[in-house]
Amino acid sequence: MACTSNLSSLSKSWAVLDVPRGAPKATGLWLKRQFIFKTSRICMCMPTPTATQPIATPLIRDNESLLKYLRQPSVLPHEVDDSRKELLGRTRRQLRSTSEPLKAMNLIDTLQRLGLAYHFEDDMNAILSQLSSSGQSDGDLLTTALRFRLLRHNGHKIVQKFMDKNGKFKDSLKEDTMGLLSLYEASHLAANGEDILLEAMELTEAHLKQSLPSLPTQLARKVSSALELPRHRRMARLEARRYIQEYSEEIGHDPNLLELAKLDYNKVQSLHQMELTEISRWWKQLGLVDKLTFARDRPLECFLWTVGILPEPKYSNCRIELAKTIAILLVIDDIFDTHGTIDELVLFTNAIRRWDLEAMEGLPEYMRICYMALYNTTNEICYKILKENGWSVLPYLKATWIDMIEGFMLEASWYNNGQEPNMEEYVANGVTTAGAYMAMVHLFFLIGQGVTEENVKLLMKPYPKLFSCSGRILRLWDDLGTAKEEQERGDLASSIQLFMRENNITCDEEGRKRILQLIDNLWKDLNWELVSRDAMPLAIIKAAFNMARSSQVVYQHEEESYFSSVDNYVESLFFTPIIN
């Protein structure tokens, strides 16, 4: 289905809305799925609020409050959009007229970081294709590493030399902080087997940490930010918000480009508010949480993740439909996690396997309501895809839901029978119950680019490695972000505890360190999927990467509560515009 949006008719609004922070706390099965939006200890890598970047506190969690807020948009002034279009034209001319490779690469890099690259995809691809076909770069370390990172990030097959003729990194590189930083960022796109890049990662990290205390303030800030979270692992829209502030402080920045980035950010924010309005109205009409009062009422947080996975404005419809599936998934997760008896869960699982309305007859009333919501929503998505592209996709979407419900049921049976899975069993099943496969299969058809008979066959079990790598990163980061709170509640057996038991590790810090190493290895596997580009369209590859990025950004730290973290992201992305 073509996922497009009409930006010219959008509006923007912002306000402060104070809503109580209460939210249900998950208890029940000791094998917590904790999908995406459960209470957990995580925090966000957000820019520090400034005078030009006011941060309010919306605390909008329940759908009724969100709907009330979204009824008060103000119209985006036409003169603002006219100015944005003029700046877009000026930037396009600048990009096309830049003949020097380094200047072109720096401009592309800046456009990507400012969240503007989607406007110039054709022009940028032409430049990158020319760079790719021109062979090895003879420039300095900064230029060479930048070229490699841009080409690989955009799906070009590229092997780059970073060594001298003796196969060693030059000692002189240690004094080139910007070059080391560029190489450090590039090294995070390394795949398994690319030993030179992996060695470069260790070398540059060590030298950057060593030099950090003596660096000028602005450069030290850049280095600290990269060491905390490399750019390859950041959420695009959040990086745009952060980098707009950083770019404004850079000496010699392009004021026209900065102005364009601010206007465009606010424009996309207006689009997100319109999308939220549609999702919130749908959720209210669905009425699930009115009947299932134990279930989570968080369409806003569901939408936050879709923006992380699909940041480009053209995927507006995709975000809306994916947010619907996530919202229903959370309700089903709560049924398995906090409410359903084992006998009821068996009935529900069998009904999902049948996938017909008669299957509801033996279910409790609350399960019938949820079953009907899932059945109708999935069929409606299938109808939209059929109408748009002529594809009959119900067998594929239905199969992913069945797989996920069976995964929930497996966890319930482990608990009910007093069984403990091994690490691999837990993680493999946890990818399914985290919704990773469900989300990626839905997106494959919703995006609708590059769909072939060959790659459609890959959407059934066993799922593509692209999906499983991204899903495993999600699963492990989820456990890292929630483990301490789960222990405080008396929950058991996350991947961390299972790994520690299997490897005779008694120190929690060491266990977490080893899980982080597993995640790093999964990123190398994921990077290989970008290098190999077998059968999957680039848009789906990028979505899988973005799912992994979103999970790392969300669950990376433990100092803040989950809701505090989500509040920061939601406020920044959806409700607070960038003002001059």
Swiss-Prot record:
Pathway, per record: Secondary metabolite biosynthesis; terpenoid biosynthesis
Residues that bind Mg(2+) 3: D478, T482, E486
Major location (coarse): plastid
Residues that coordinate or bind Mg(2+) 2: D333, D337
Reported cofactor(s): Mg(2+); Mn(2+)
Keywords: Chloroplast, Magnesium, Metal-binding, Plastid, Transit peptide
GO cellular component: chloroplast
InterPro entries: Isoprenoid_synthase_dom_sf (IPR008949), Terpene_cyclase-like_1_C (IPR034741), Terpene_cyclase_plant_C1 (IPR044814), Terpene_synth_N (IPR001906), Terpene_synth_N_sf (IPR036965), Terpene_synthase-like (IPR050148), Terpene_synthase_metal-bd (IPR005630), Terpenoid_cyclase/PrenylTrfase (IPR008930)
Reported tissue expression: Confined to flowers.
Family: Belongs to the terpene synthase family. Tpsg subfamily.
Function: Monoterpene synthase (mono-TPS) involved in the biosynthesis of monoterpenes natural products, constituent of coffee beverage aroma.
Name of the molecule in the record: Putative monoterpene synthase 8
